[in-house]
């Protein structure tokens, strides 16, 4: 699935053999990055440096390990950290930024602890470029969950961790409200309400698993979203894929949902729609089990899942059914192992520690290897 030699570029740590410790902010360090997006194969690259509450940008795709970032958004300079730059919430601050994606000609970021999604209409090309649009809040100065209300709505969010833009539609994993929101077109005004909801019966509900046991429609902790091509795309189009980390599963819709609370077609990681245990109730994982899967991406006929708490990536190809086992593995020696960095004292170019986010651009898979405070650029092995 990925090149067996390991990551071609490592960003964020001095070397692949360094001990993992919290790092002070600089142009080369990261602290628990949870998302990254390579806009084109030549760059730019944007990273959600989550623990430092900032976004880091590279003008071109990095060519050497620990290459320093060119831009920072969210802090006054590369040496600073703190939620909302230790001040008030603005169009150029973030608090626990997580999901990040190309969005039209610009960029979208799930600014999780500000309970909002930020949209730049054009790609930022400087430090602290302010966002143009905010979703989940009425304006850029607000940051309360669900706009300070106990009930949610189509224009509110609570801990949104995932965002993706696909074929003109914007999708957000509104994680704390246990749902996925969709906008039919790229929003143009602040606080624009979503058009469709998955995981809940309507826009006002927010109970985990809809207030009952898990079903093909319910969610507990949706985190990341991608689209996986079908074998017959001209007939079926893309499949929607959502990681439901709280239910230790990945949900797949065979076609793009068109109705609120539409049930998924298949789950991976569980044998039934109503089972939810991590690693299917046993200590060690298998090729068919998951433990808090946070990230997901698709490239060609591959679906790649960050099985986060098992510190590994799993790969599926082509067609899947409920509980289909993975056919590819990265980060562990076998499907029954789950140690951080494969139980090695130091991270290596092939190891992972709590990988949170994955994205793909061309032949390059970008992995937010959060527990190792680094981002990996790793080539596919077609």
Task: Walk through the language-model features, giving the residues of each.
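Surface-exposed loop and turn segments in beta-propeller and other repeat-based domains
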Residues: 3-26, 69-90, 130-153, 193-216, ...
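Signature of short aromatic-glycine-proline-rich micro-motifs recurring in repeat-based ectodomains
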Residues: 22-38, 86-103, 147-165, 211-232, ...
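Conserved beta-propeller blade signature
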Residues: 44-47, 106-109, 169-172, 233-234, ...
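Short loop/turn segments immediately following the C-termini of beta-strands
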Residues: 50-51, 60, 112-113, 122, ...
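Structural signal for beta-propeller blades
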Residues: 53-55, 115-117, 179-180, 248-250, ...
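Short loop/turn segments immediately following beta-strands, especially the blade-tip
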Residues: 58-66, 120-129, 183-192, 253-265, ...
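Loop/turn-rich, solvent-exposed surfaces of beta-rich toroidal or solenoidal domains
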Residues: 294-317
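Blade-level signature of beta-propeller repeat domains, shared across WD40, Kelch, NHL, RCC1
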Residues: 311, 354-382
């Amino acid at each position: 699935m990925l090149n067996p030699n390991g990551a071609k570029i490592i960003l964020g740590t001095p070397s692949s053999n360094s001990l993992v410790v919290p790092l002070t902010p600089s142009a080369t360090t990261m602290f628990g990055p949870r998302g990254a997006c390579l806009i084109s194969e030549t760059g730019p690259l944007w990273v959600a440096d989550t623990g430092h509450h900032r976004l880091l940008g590279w003008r071109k795709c990095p060519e050497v390990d620990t290459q320093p970032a060119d831009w920072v958004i969210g802090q006054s300079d590369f040496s600073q950290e703190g939620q909302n730059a230790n001040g008030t919430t603005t169009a150029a601050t973030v608090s626990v930024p997580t999901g990040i994606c190309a969005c039209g000609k610009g960029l979208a970021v799930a600014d999780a602890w500000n309970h909002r999604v930020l949209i730049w209409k054009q790609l930022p090309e400087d430090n602290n470029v302010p966002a143009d649009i905010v979703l989940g809040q009425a304006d850029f100065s607000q940051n309360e969950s669900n706009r300070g209300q106990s009930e949610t709505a189509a224009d509110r969010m609570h801990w949104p961790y995932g965002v993706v833009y696909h074929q003109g539609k914007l999708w957000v994993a509104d994680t704390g409200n246990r749902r996925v929101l969709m906008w039919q077109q790229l929003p143009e005004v602040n606080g624009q309400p979503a058009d469709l909801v998955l995981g809940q019966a309507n826009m006002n509900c927010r109970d985990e698993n809809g207030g009952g046991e898990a079903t093909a429609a319910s969610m507990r902790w949706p985190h990341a979203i991608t689209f996986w091509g079908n074998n017959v795309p001209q007939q079926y189009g893309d499949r929607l894929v959502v990681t439901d980390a709280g239910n230790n599963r990945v949900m797949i819709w065979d076609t793009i949902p068109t109705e609120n609370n539409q049930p998924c077609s298949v789950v991976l990681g569980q044998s039934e729609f109503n089972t939810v245990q991590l690693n299917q109730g046993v200590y060690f994982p298998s090729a068919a089990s998951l433990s808090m899967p946070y990230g997901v991406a698709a490239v060609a006929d591959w679906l790649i899942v960050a099985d986060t708490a098992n510190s590994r990536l799993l790969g599926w190809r082509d067609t899947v059914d409920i509980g289909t086992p993975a056919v590819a593995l990265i980060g562990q020696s076998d499907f029954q192992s789950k140690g951080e960095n494969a139980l090695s004292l130091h991270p290596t170019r092939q190891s992972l520690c709590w990988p949170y986010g994955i994205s793909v651009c061309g032949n390059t898979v970008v992995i937010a290897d959060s527990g190792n405070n680094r981002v990996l650029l790793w080539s596919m092995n077609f």
